[in-house]
């Protein structure tokens, strides 16, 4: 998103004497505030639901002053944008309103009048007083965590009053939140979200004909927990969650792989080999599984060599020619 593209391409053919760049641009934009304080032009359509009022959003944005090629504010150069909660983390009222009009994957251009941006005073020296600003915003994703927070605060009895689909939806949101935190390397926080999802699914009583839906939702959460505990250097707990996943699907290659990784860290080499060979049987050409088997072989060779050296030292003759145990 560059200012050069904005200034050169957006307004071609729309020149009008005496009108500024933003005035000409505003003529083709949609009024979403009701007073033309926030105007919108969709560059790329999104899909799915609109952003919920209490959602946490993952966005990329760049803010421009009129006739400036470079943004005065942008997070486009960050590898991973920060998750921001509506009503708390977003300081521009215009951006808040704009996001509420967007769907996942949407890219849009907005004009914010001063009362929806930096006010009559601006933000010296960067933003002059009474300045209209342009923002290009891409909505990567959003999580309606407020709904799940409220649901998780209910008692088990209250949660049972809701249909199963509601529980599955909330659990999926918790898992998505955990996945985001995991990608940020915030493993402890991710673990908390995964555990919340698992608790919801475990305490949900479902009729036999719907139990398979609960088990299907549990499986990826258990796999996430196993991987997260490996990242937290807690292989015993990682193994526990991996084995729980295998109860649901005994041939699941990812669960077998996680169990093998955990056993290798615990130096339980035979168990590690058993799990990894079973995983390889399910996915013979999986690069990660095959590499882990090579790593296991190397670790086991080192272990055997160290054992031999230890026993050799224990039974080696003493320096004066006497053997261990001689008086």
Swiss-Prot record:
Residues 54-143 form the PPIase FKBP-type domain. One of its GO terms (biological process) is spermatogenesis. TPR repeats lie at residues 171-204, 219-252, 253-286. GO terms for molecular function: FK506 binding; Hsp90 protein binding; identical protein binding. One of its GO terms (cellular component) is microtubule cytoskeleton. The keyword Hydrolase does not apply. It holds the Pfam family FKBP_C. Detected in all tissues examined, with higher expression in testis, heart, skeletal muscle, liver, and kidney. InterPro entries: FKBP6/shu, PPIase_dom_sf, PPIase_FKBP_dom, TPR-like_helical_dom_sf, TPR_rpt. Keywords: Cytoplasm, Differentiation, Disease variant, Meiosis, Nucleus, Repeat, RNA-mediated gene silencing, Spermatogenesis, TPR repeat, Williams-Beuren syndrome. The keyword Nucleus applies. Transmembrane segments: none annotated. It is found in: Cytoplasm; Nucleus. It comes from the Eukaryota. Interacts (via TPR repeats) with HSP90. Interacts with HSP72/HSPA2 and CLTC. Interacts with GAPDH; leading to inhibit GAPDH catalytic activity. Has an essential role in spermatogenesis. It is required to repress transposable elements and prevent their mobilization, which is essential for the germline integrity. Acts via the piRNA metabolic process, which mediates the repression of transposable elements during meiosis by forming complexes composed of piRNAs and Piwi proteins and govern the methylation and subsequent repression of transposons. Acts as a co-chaperone via its interaction with HSP90 and is required for the piRNA amplification process, the secondary piRNA biogenesis. It is linked to FKBP6 is located in the Williams-Beuren syndrome (WBS) critical region. WBS results from a hemizygous deletion of several genes on chromosome 7q11.23, thought to arise as a consequence of unequal crossing over between highly homologous low-copy repeat sequences flanking the deleted region. Haploinsufficiency of FKBP6 may be the cause of certain cardiovascular and musculo-skeletal abnormalities observed in the disease. A father and son with Williams-Beuren syndrome appear to have a common heterozygous deletion that includes FKBP6 gene. Belongs to the FKBP6 family. This is Inactive peptidyl-prolyl cis-trans isomerase FKBP6. It comes from Homo sapiens (Human). The lineage of its organism: Eukaryota, Metazoa, Chordata, Craniata, Vertebrata.
């Amino acid at each position: 998103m560059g200012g050069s593209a904005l200034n050169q391409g957006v307004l071609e053919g729309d020149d009008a004497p005496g009108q500024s760049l933003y005035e000409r641009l505003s003529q083709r934009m949609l009024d979403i505030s009701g007073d033309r304080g926030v105007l919108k032009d969709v560059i790329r359509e999104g899909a799915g639901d609109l952003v919920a009022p209490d959602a946490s959003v993952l966005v990329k944005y760049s803010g421009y002053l009129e006739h400036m090629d470079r943004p005065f504010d942008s997070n486009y150069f960050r590898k991973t944008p920060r998750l921001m909660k509506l009503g708390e983390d977003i300081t521009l009222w215009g951006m808040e309103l704009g996001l509420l009009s967007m769907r996942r994957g949407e890219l849009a251009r907005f004009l914010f009048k001063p009362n929806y941006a930096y006010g009559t005073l601006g933000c010296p020296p960067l933003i002059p007083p009474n300045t209209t600003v342009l923002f290009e915003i891409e909505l990567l994703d959003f999580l309606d965590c407020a709904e799940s927070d409220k649901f998780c605060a209910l008692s088990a009895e209250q949660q049972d009053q809701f249909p199963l689909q509601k529980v599955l939806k909330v659990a999926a949101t918790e898992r998505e939140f955990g996945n985001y935190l995991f990608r940020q390397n915030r493993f402890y926080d991710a673990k908390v979200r995964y555990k919340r999802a698992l608790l919801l699914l475990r305490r949900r009583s479902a009729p036999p004909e719907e139990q398979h839906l609960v088990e299907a939702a549990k499986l990826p959460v258990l796999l996430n927990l196993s991987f997260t505990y490996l990242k937290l250097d807690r292989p015993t707990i990682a193994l526990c969650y991996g084995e729980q996943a295998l109860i649901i699907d005994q041939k699941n290659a990812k669960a077998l792989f996680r169990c093998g990784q955990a056993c290798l860290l615990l130096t339980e080499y035979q168990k590690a080999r058993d799990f990894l060979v079973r995983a390889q049987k399910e996915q013979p050409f999986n690069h990660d599984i095959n590499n882990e088997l090579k790593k296991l072989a190397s670790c086991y060779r080192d272990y055997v060599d160290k054992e031999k050296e230890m026993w050799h030292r224990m039974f080696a003759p003493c320096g004066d020619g006497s053997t261990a145990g001689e008086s």
